[in-house]
From Swiss-Prot:
Pfam families: DUF494. InterPro entries: Smg (IPR007456). Belongs to the Smg family. PANTHER family: PROTEIN SMG (PTHR38692:SF1). This is Protein Smg.
Length: 157
């Protein structure tokens, strides 16, 4: 499913291609690209749930309103998000790329993924997808994009 999400993000969203694509055509394009129907269905469902945040139909769980509070992760969250992922989320909060709400959206979307392996690079892409879809997060999205791509470019020098 995560491969389908990455393909969709890079092909349709990140490239600013036509965003209004017929779902049947999209499913056919994904099938033609070699993705399994179940993965396609799960990815589209994942994106629907993300769109619920955008449309105000869903809100992230509010655990604390004090910005100085520390997020304690559940065992399930710790299993999916290793120490480097949790540290990266904290770093993004400290530099104000994520706020309490967007952090919870990211965590919820990570837990909704069905892949067994989940790494820091995967988290970065989920963060980009969440920030891209949330109104008012354009600056945070741009900062995250710069962080993601500058780090990779810096490695080439």
């Amino acid at each position: 499913m995560f491969d389908v999400l990455m393909y969709l993000f890079e092909t349709y969203i990140h490239t600013e291609a036509e965003l209004r694509v017929d779902q049947d055509k999209l499913e056919q394009d994904l099938t033609d690209a070699g993705f399994e129907r179940e993965d396609i269905y799960n990815a589209l469902l994942w994106l629907e749930k993300l769109a619920d945040y955008q449309e105000g139909l869903a809100e992230p769980m509010q655990l604390a309103s004090d910005p100085l509070s520390m997020r304690i992760y559940t065992p399930e969250e710790c299993e999916r998000l290793d120490a480097s992922c949790r540290g990266f989320l904290l770093f993004l909060e400290q530099i104000q790329v994520l706020n309490l709400e967007t952090r919870e959206m990211v965590i919820e979307r990570v837990l909704a993924l069905d892949n067994a392996e989940f790494e820091l690079d995967d988290l970065k892409w989920v963060i980009l997808m969440v920030l891209f879809n949330i109104p008012g997060c354009e600056n945070a999205y741009q900062q995250m994009e710069e962080l993601l791509f500058e780090v990779n470019e810096g490695m080439l020098h």
